[in-house]
């Protein structure tokens, strides 16, 4: 991952978002870069109570792409039947930045979705189904 990315100290994270940040950072190709667990009286940079997000960068590699595919399947296909959790790309205007520097990924929750439930789900499906891209490549040989 890029040198400028460092994991946020646990004491700086909103309590209800820590487990989701931790499970995302447990993937080798992911580095979280922002989060908010929602607040009863939010400041301008915070989200309202009952909503939350985690934003992250993904390594530009086969492993990174494989991890994105896994999360897209797990979150968008297997997890949220009510469509209140969204996994999607986000970007600043690319013409204002260097190439390959604006794309990030975000998971957003609405309608009082519990980020800890998503974290538990991701821990389970990662344990049960996730294989590294490298291990899958060697299977076909």
Predicted regions and their residues:
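Structured alpha/beta or helical-core interaction and ligand-binding surfaces enriched in interleaved
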Residues: 1-141
